[in-house]
Amino acid sequence: MFTAQTNLVYQGAKQTKRTVLGSLDVINNFKREEILDFYHKWYRPDLQAIIVVGDIDAAQMENKIRSQFSDIPKAVNPTPKEVYLAPKANGPIFENLIDSTLSFTALKVFYRMPYPAREVRSTEAFYKDLYIRDILANIMTERMKEQVRTGKADAKSAVMVNYAESSDYYVDLYTILGKKDGNLLDLIDFYAGNEKSMIEYGVSQDEIEAAKMLVRKRYHLDRPKKAESLRNEDFVGVCHNNFVSGAALTDPATLHGIQNRILKDISLEDVKPYVAKVFSESDKIYSWFANPKDLAKVPSLEDTKARLDQVRAREAKPNFLTFNKIDLTVNYPEGTIVKENNVKGLDGTKEWILSNGAKVYWTAVKDSKVTPDLSLLVYFGSGYNALPQDRFASSLFAGEFIRANAGFRGATADEIGKMPECGGISRSLRISDRFAGIFTTAPAKKAENAFRIAALTVTDPFLPQAKVLQQMKDKKLESLSEPKKDAVRFSEACDSIIYGNHPWSVDIDSAAVDGVDMDLAEEIYSREFNPAAGMTLFIASNLDETTIKEYVRKYIATIPTDGKTVTKAKVRERIPAFKGTQVYSMTGKKEINPYTIVTRMFSSKVKPTPKNLAAVDFVDYILSQRLLNQIRENRGGTYTIRFNSYVSVREKGRSESEITFKTRPDLYEVLVGDLDDIVSEFCSGGPSEKELEEARKWLIKNETESKAKKAMSMPHRNSQVMNYVRNGINPNIDRVAAYGSVTAEDVRKVAGKLTGKNVLTTIYTEE
């Protein structure tokens, strides 16, 4: 798909004939002299860079680099790098893409514009230009989405994205999907009508400000970047981008601040000239993307051109978006913290009992490098057992609708995300087997609003109109109307074998979708996000305790918890239920190329001591290396394969391990034999001393680096406390010390426990 789109952008250029590496014929048949010539032609000093970042003596390192690399001879008459652009377009281009792998029909429109020269890319003007283009693309997307949402468009979905094509072009790409039985020419009306309205009337200041928030998220400018929290890879990235594309060579934290300032300062007057640049003056490529079986529905070139002319001859109307204002005031009387305790085993964490019965676990993080400044998790004691079990599949679909759309105080989730007072605050809802939750993060200046948002999500929830639910149902029903692929049927059969027809192993079928209405959606929300079912909060922040207590009293202790509760079902969570040794295989109809996917699952139990958990990591690492060496390197049978295990501390050591690989149908039996031999030999003989020490070295290094990286994440700090309280996972375990104590015999024994009880092998082939 991406290659096909790139070929449309580069029509007539060398890129459409082959990749940079060459054609398949060249790759398969090159001579030794040719590859050496290629190496000397392009792998030369003037096209290379050495980037070193770390705790080093810079002068000493520079001298070392000079001594090691200075004797490499400079290239004589070096071959200049050439730029291969597409021929200049003489008017709009019309080129369809008909491909049997496509599962949709869409109108694609490409706007192609020159990319800024290298010498411009390190300037503020470059970033301003980039952000304005993104602002316009986001405004167009939001306008089209609103028309689809309100039923004013005959499209199923529509989006416009701005991206760079290999530093040759800026491309704005529309992707507009038609409804199943709709007239595809209506998509031309939709696209061209929005384009003309944009050209004639431009954009509003409110639209620009809302789009800035989306642009800020796209480029991660909403995430704090403090100088003290920068990592080596941040500096490497800046240096790499400067060398490869000419981007600004600036301290990452400083650059982050500059980029935020540039985006903030963009005005309506800055944006106005770009409307013509993008929507009128760019090269335009029109393409229908479709599967051959739908070719009869695709409009002809003549009909497409004629419809474009008709729409552009019509009178356009303003199409500005309007934005609701939201009141974040919480009107309930302030509550109190009635009891405080230190949490045993967790330094810096306290348990507060509130006057409404809610529990709060507060963790003070005294490190300004940890970002963002606040992580707030709200858990409710509901989960799947609080759903109506006789309408379980419908309830799951209602949950999907809630997660995607639920807001508060008359605003949907999408609208909330565009409001300045909510900018920089992340908010998501989740319904799972054990709980429902609200997950929020915020910078310090928006922390109070984050608490308000959490409270209002509980006390004043809002679901959009039934029309939005119907659109979501229509999309789901359309996808369900397609013939079920063999791979999907195989996956469903495997699910049944693995979980033993668990009552929660249900498909959301057409009957389940039809069974969802707004009454059910509202019922599911009230069942799941229900303080009366038990409400526990986890808060981690570098704000002072006095401030956090104030917010908790004003916004959390105020939440009424005396509402109605439902009688929860007593269904146990889904866990693997297969016993003994089982094999399930199926052959399906070939979709593209023949292949076989083999999955070997193990279900067992390992006592979750620190040493055993460390030994599990050794098993995963060493067995993965053995499998890679034999099945990928020696057999050439797959691209990737690994042994991966999970041990539940909460469930007293219940374990799952899995090996999955994709290969050719004629080879899988040999590879399964290899897999059997490797696992059997490892469980009987264990690792060699060399394997053990290599694994130990890598695991200690990975743990040290991973721990340091995760320690800079406030949500990670908070989730550690949550996992300790809810799942019994001790964050204070010294994994490095545990790795240091593991012996070869420990690894062998744990490997036997992981793989020695219940084994399921599933094999799916398409040929």
Which residues fall in each region the model found?
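His/Glu-rich zincin catalytic helix
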Residues: 36-41, 45-151, 188, 290-418, ...
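Extended, hydrophobic interaction surfaces within ordered domains
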Residues: 250-253, 257-317
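Short, exposed beta-strand-loop hairpins at the edges of beta-sheets
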Residues: 751-753
